[in-house]
Amino acid sequence: MAPNAADKCPVMGNSGEKCPVMSSSTQSRGPRDIYTLEALSHFNREKIPERAVHAKGTGAYGEFEVTADISDICNIDMLLGVGKKTQCVTRFSTTGLERGSSDGVRDLKGMAVKFFTEQGDWDWVSLNFPFFFIRDPAKFPDMIHSQRRDPQTNLLNPNMTWDFVTKNPEALHMTLLQHSDFGTMFTWRTLSSYVGHAFKWVMPDGSFKYVHFFLASDRGPNFTDGSTAKVDPNDPDFATKDLFEAIERGDYPSWTANVQVVDPKDAPKLGFNILDLTKHWNLGTYPKGLDTIPSRPFGKLTLNRNVKDYFSEVEKLAFSPSNLVPGVEPSEDPILQARMFAYPDAQRYRLGIDHLKAPLRRKETACQHDLGPEFEKWLSQVTSEAWSHPHEDDYKFAREYYEVLPEFRSQEFQDRMVENLCKSIAPGPEELRKRVYDTFELVSSELARRLREGAEAIVAEKARPDSPSRAQPGQLRL
């Protein structure tokens, strides 16, 4: 049969060359249309495994500009010199669910930034909360599974979440925030993000400071009359579209970079463990009675360019908290130490062993200063296996978050959080509900009472024969 005209031939393979293609697909001795075979084989392999967490996401390019001199605490080339600019790419994401899920799910939100510095890539891998559910990395798989779909029904099941929380009280602090208005979707443009972990900024002489840095949205969380902006339930990609369209029309979102600083000699005196990821560095809101760790603004991140090809420019991005540059070192935080292995290992599975064509090398700056026996004793205590067990601070931080909400936001803000918790608790069996109430009794008797009364009222209402709805196993988490 006659070949197709070259100008009608699809571009095949990596060469991009056009050539005549025979229209016959098979002959008596088998397939001969190698171009069709090549196209089919490429199609079969064009997708890659989705991320184990943070599968649903979007991204954009931008730049970071230094806005303040922090050379007294910092020896990082990218941050030295007011006005210095660095190009970057940012990826936003939800955490627990799959790639096709909604932007508006009640979930942690991720904001990862890769800075293309003159000394290599520096990744800030952040969440929209300054703390996390766990401090023991061995619990991470169980924690994530508790937030995902029921393995039997493939529906979201709040009972799995509450089973985990009641057995791991360090998760109470995070659980309260997740069920408040902070846990619902704003937009990616109004999302603030926190690295959560302590890092070390190391000076040329080997001295260092513990630091926690974060990006505060210049638009702020878009609370209106104490509530969050509602996501269109018919548009699961609401935030993705909002970010893309804003950048296209020149309405560039921006964030102010801030850093909190702790001298290692002061760390044992703060009244809480700065290496415990279930606790935040107090900016002055809560807990009362603990030292405030003020922040210093030092830069501005602006996103000003959309990607052209999502798959190659965003889906294939590989972030890791181990991607550091000279002047930055990881702290002894156990979760951080585990993430520094888990992230690159996940990329090797998802993208292959050669996803880093030219592995980056950084010069180590050893922390050599002798900080004395008090610091060494504190460090050995707060990184010991015993510290992973429940203790009073796990309840204290959750308690003070609950109590500060009317003052920090509004009474209605606190009431909505309680209502969301009740709706999530109510579908569970009686034994699990009782365990939840007993757990919250250790946080606040008032909160436990409100949860018991609210959740049991929902249970009673749904048990009525004429109730329009009944609690179903695995129903959507509210």
UniProtKB/Swiss-Prot annotation:
CC cofactor: heme
GO CC, any one term: mitochondrion
Residues involved in heme binding: 343
Annotated pathway: Alkaloid biosynthesis; ergot alkaloid biosynthesis
Region annotation Disordered: where it falls in the sequence: 459-478
Molecular function per GO: catalase activity; heme binding; metal ion binding
Record flagged with keyword Oxidoreductase: yes
EC number: 1.11.-.-
Pfam family, one: Catalase
Enzyme class: oxidoreductase
Record's function text: Catalase; part of the gene cluster that mediates the biosynthesis of fungal ergot alkaloid. DmaW catalyzes the first step of ergot alkaloid biosynthesis by condensing dimethylallyl diphosphate (DMAP) and tryptophan to form 4-dimethylallyl-L-tryptophan. The second step is catalyzed by the methyltransferase easF that methylates 4-dimethylallyl-L-tryptophan in the presence of S-adenosyl-L-methionine, resulting in the formation of 4-dimethylallyl-L-abrine.
Family from the record: Belongs to the catalase family.
Protein name: Catalase easC
Organism, as annotated: Trichophyton verrucosum (strain HKI 0517)
Source organism phylogeny: Eukaryota, Fungi, Dikarya, Ascomycota, Pezizomycotina
Recorded name of the encoding gene: easC
